[in-house]
From Swiss-Prot:
Gene (name only): msrA
Organism of origin: Acinetobacter baumannii (strain AYE)
Matching Gene3D superfamilies: Peptide methionine sulphoxide reductase MsrA (3.30.1060.10)
Positions annotated as active site in the UniProt record: C10
Enzymatic reactions: L-methionyl-[protein] + [thioredoxin]-disulfide + H2O = L-methionyl-(S)-S-oxide-[protein] + [thioredoxin]-dithiol; [thioredoxin]-disulfide + L-methionine + H2O = L-methionine (S)-S-oxide + [thioredoxin]-dithiol
Name this protein carries in UniProt: Peptide methionine sulfoxide reductase MsrA
Record EC number: 1.8.4.11
Family of the protein in this entry: Belongs to the MsrA Met sulfoxide reductase family.
HAMAP family: MsrA
Length: 173
């Protein structure tokens, strides 16, 4: 089992996307990249911790590759807006890839360079994986548990539509 650690805005949105991908065994919403140990959602939302909302993805590389996960990541959030995804503004919503090894770093660098070659101004941060702090239980599988919640209804369906149209071959049955 491999792991990936991505931040692309609200973790509810990112989690909802990656739970649809075959080979993804588990997605855990949480926090990483800041200076506060064991931060709470409220602390992260205040913006003082410097943590990003992230998802830790456990995946089977025999079914989906890290590079494929990177493709999904970049296609389902805006990697060109600094510290913002839609109406969510703040460093906690930054676009970030935390890598666990040199292979992941190189794959991310290659993907970012390919996007830059297409004239996209990518602001995604690329850093070694820091300590990951799981978010509170009520954040886990949030969209699955709260599909009619207002924010979820607004923000997640467009991401899932994009996922289904571009990555049908990666979807769980």
């Amino acid at each position: 089992m491999q792991q990936a650690l991505f931040g692309g805005g609200c973790f509810w949105c990112v989690e909802a996307v990656f739970l649809q991908i075959r080979g993804v065994e588990k997605v855990t919403s949480g926090y990483a990249g800041g200076h506060t140990t064991h931060p709470t959602y409220e602390q992260v939302c205040q913006g003082d911790t410097q943590h990003a909302e992230v998802v830790l993805i456990d995946f089977d590389e025999q079914q989906v590759t890290y590079s494929q996960l990177l493709d999904v990541f970049f296609a389902t959030h805006d990697p060109t807006t600094l510290n913002r995804q839609g109406n969510d503004i703040g460093t906690q919503y930054r676009s970030v890839i935390y890598y666990f090894n040199e292979e992941q770093k190189q794959a991310a660098e290659h993907t970012i360079q390919t996007l830059k070659d297409d004239d996209l101004d990518i602001v995604t941060e690329l850093s070694p994986a820091p300590t990951f702090y799981p978010a509170e239980d009520y954040h886990q599988n949030y969209y699955e548990k709260n599909p009619s919640q207002g924010y979820c209804n607004f923000a997640i369906p467009p991401k899932l539509l994009k996922l289904h149209s571009k990555f049908q071959h990666l979807m769980k049955n």
